């Protein structure tokens, strides 16, 4: 089976926080799992860099938008690499492949008769001599009264807005009052695909219920044509006849990045023909890891665009959406510096600590909240005391009593039964991962470690070592095999720690099933060191405040 795994493209006007990291980590865990199972996977994402927020920021800084996004793209690429995200292609919307693909794609949709032209009234700034789309306008939200709402969305109540909805609108650049002027734009005829979308959603058993319910509700209410163009300068030029000076709306071009990123991946490999093999084959499944606020773009707009192209692109197999991640019970806020940003997290602890906790508390069915108290508890109790302690006890015993050598012995009945149960837990991990129940899969991994601790305690090899060596040898061999299997599954969630454990087991390369599940392919235990350490929340909070006061990372200097 071929798989396309994708995470939502982060908008790179700022460093992502832990809420964004949840989706990225989730997609990475799933991609790593599929590779472990021998599936053919292309894992993609990229930097979303067009649109008004970046254009406005560049104007304020007196630099070109591309100069700003070059810097941010490089920084965010480094952050994802530092977190162990195993993208096959992390690209950007400024890539030549993406820009060419988007223009060609929309020209095909236009020629198929699914895009039309309409004259509309838009806000215009006479002083700056420009139309004011999206965030080029600020004003009072008509729903909640927030006085600094943007022309595309209110940051307080979350309602999506049009610039003309705002009360007392003002130009974001110069602060002057805009006027209404007529301008021409192009629209995607989304309502035309209502029935095809309804059928696709109703018949897709792999879409989560919350995504199905929301999407079908929107279809029932009646879909509206979607604006395709903007009067921005910073974006992909619209390809339609008479559309000179217009760009493709950032949301409507970035969503096509899932397709263009796969095309770019195979072009880089010199295998251009494989792009269609992946995207236009009935044997390919595509899965998208997103937040619940992005559901409509992935269950309605993106599938409708793929249908409209007439090119036979595979529709989304599943949309793995999550609820919101909060910080100590409240929404993340850059302006109020509430939350933890990715570069700050890396300054506090190694990436695997965050990978572990973000998946452990992944908001799969309801909103979840990061709390320092729970973070401390789960890292210390589950990661350090359960997994780390198991590894230390077994390997220390092998190093001291067996000089690092793994005994070659026939396993007794109890030890064989123990490993059978370990394999059963392994299958539970795999089943949960395939169902994208990542929290349950990680909890099963912890249960495997608990079972190992119980087995080692009950067997007491330190007593048998002198009096019943055969039983002690059987205990140690079974425990060593457990650690190999544990490392194999850990590599999906915490790759750096798993590779560290694999090396301590005296094994080469990275954890693989052929060696992990073998009773004979064993190494020599050496170079022991703690796999994890305990943390103290007070120390981490103090260190975080220090990072911000000193401006040690980019996100701290942005605020």
Swiss-Prot record:
UniProt remark on cofactor binding: Binds 1 zinc ion per subunit.
Family of the protein in this entry: Belongs to the class-I aminoacyl-tRNA synthetase family. MetG type 1 subfamily.
Localisation per UniProt entry: Cytoplasm
Function statement: Is required not only for elongation of protein synthesis but also for the initiation of all mRNA translation through initiator tRNA(fMet) aminoacylation.
Transmembrane segments: none
Positions of ATP binding: 334
Molecular function GO terms recorded: ATP binding; metal ion binding; methionine-tRNA ligase activity
Keywords: Aminoacyl-tRNA synthetase, ATP-binding, Cytoplasm, Ligase, Metal-binding, Nucleotide-binding, Protein biosynthesis, Zinc
Requisite cofactors: Zn(2+)
Enzyme Commission designation: 6.1.1.10
Gene Ontology CC entries for this record: aminoacyl-tRNA synthetase multienzyme complex; cytosol
GO BP annotations listed: methionyl-tRNA aminoacylation
Reaction(s) catalysed by this chain's protein: tRNA(Met) + L-methionine + ATP = L-methionyl-tRNA(Met) + AMP + diphosphate
Pfam families membership: Anticodon_3, tRNA-synt_1g
Residue window of motif 'HIGH' region: 10-20
Residues the record lists as binding Zn(2+): 141, 144, 154, 157
InterPro entries given in the database record: aa-tRNA-synth_I_CS, Anticodon_Met, Met-tRNA_ligase_1, Met-tRNA_synth, Methionyl/Leucyl_tRNA_Synth, MetRS_core, MetRS_Zn, Rossmann-like_a/b/a_fold
Official protein name in the record: Methionine--tRNA ligase
Renumbered ranges of motif 'KMSKS' region: 331-335
């Amino acid at each position: 089976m071929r798989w396309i795994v994708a995470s939502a493209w982060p908008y790179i006007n700022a460093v992502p926080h832990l809420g964004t990291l949840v989706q990225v980590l989730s997609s990475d865990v799933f991609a790593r799992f599929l590779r472990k199972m021998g599936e053919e996977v292309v894992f993609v994402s990229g930097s979303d860099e067009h649109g008004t927020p970046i254009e406005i920021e560049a104007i304020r800084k007196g630099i070109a938008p591309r100069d700003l996004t070059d810097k941010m793209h490089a920084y965010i690429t480094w952050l994802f690499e530092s977190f162990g995200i195993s993208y096959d292609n992390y690209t950007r919307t400024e890539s030549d492949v993406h820009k060419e693909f988007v223009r060609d794609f929309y020209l095909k949709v236009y020629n198929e008769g699914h895009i039309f032209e309409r004259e509309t009234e838009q806000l215009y700034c006479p002083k700056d001599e420009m139309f004011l789309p999206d965030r080029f306008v600020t004003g009072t939200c008509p729903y909640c009264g927030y006085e600094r709402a943007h022309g595309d969305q209110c940051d307080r109540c979350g309602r999506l807005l049009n610039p003309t909805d705002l009360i007392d609108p003002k130009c974001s650049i110069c602060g002057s009052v805009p006027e209404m002027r007529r301008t021409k734009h192009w629209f995607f005829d989304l309502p035309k695909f209502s029935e095809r979308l309804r059928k696709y959603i109703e018949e897709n058993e792999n879409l989560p219920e919350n995504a199905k319910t929301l999407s079908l509700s929107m279809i029932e209410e009646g879909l509206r044509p979607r604006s395709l163009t903007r009067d921005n300068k910073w974006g992909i030029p619209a390809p339609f006849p008479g559309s000179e000076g217009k760009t493709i709306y950032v949301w409507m071009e970035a969503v096509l990045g899932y397709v263009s990123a796969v095309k770019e991946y195979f072009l880089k490999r010199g295998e251009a023909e494989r792009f269609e093999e992946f995207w236009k084959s009935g044997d390919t499944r595509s899965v998208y890891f997103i937040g619940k606020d992005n559901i409509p773009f992935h269950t309605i707009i993106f599938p409708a665009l793929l249908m409209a192209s007439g090119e036979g692109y595979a529709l989304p197999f599943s949309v793995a959406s999550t609820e919101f991640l909060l910080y100590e019970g409240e929404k993340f806020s850059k302006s109020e510096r509430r939350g933890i940003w990715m570069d700050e997290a890396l300054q506090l602890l190694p990436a695997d600590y965050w990978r572990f906790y973000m998946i452990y508390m992944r908001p799969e069915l309801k909103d979840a909240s990061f709390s320092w108290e729970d973070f401390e508890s789960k890292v210390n109790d589950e990661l350090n005391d359960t997994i780390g302690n198991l590894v230390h006890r077994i390997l220390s015993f092998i190093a001291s009593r067996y000089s690092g050598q793994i005994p070659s012995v026939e396993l007794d009945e109890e030890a064989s039964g123990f490993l059978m149960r370990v394999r059963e837990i392994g299958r539970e991990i795999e089943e949960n991962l395939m169902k994208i129940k990542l929290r349950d899969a990680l909890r099963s991994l912890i249960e495997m470690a608990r079972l190992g601790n119980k087995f080692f305690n009950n067997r007491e090899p330190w007593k048998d070592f002198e009096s019943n060596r055969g039983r002690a040898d059987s205990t140690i061999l079974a425990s060593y095999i457990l650690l190999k299997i544990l490392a194999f599954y850990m590599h999906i969630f915490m790759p750096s720690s798993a590779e560290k454990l694999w090396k301590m087991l005296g094994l080469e390369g990275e954890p693989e099933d052929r060696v992990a599940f073998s009773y004979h392919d064993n190494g020599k235990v050496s170079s022991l060191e703690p796999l994890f350490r305990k943390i103290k929340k007070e120390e981490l909070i103090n260190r975080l405040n220090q990072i911000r006061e000193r401006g040690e990372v980019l996100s701290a200097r942005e605020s």
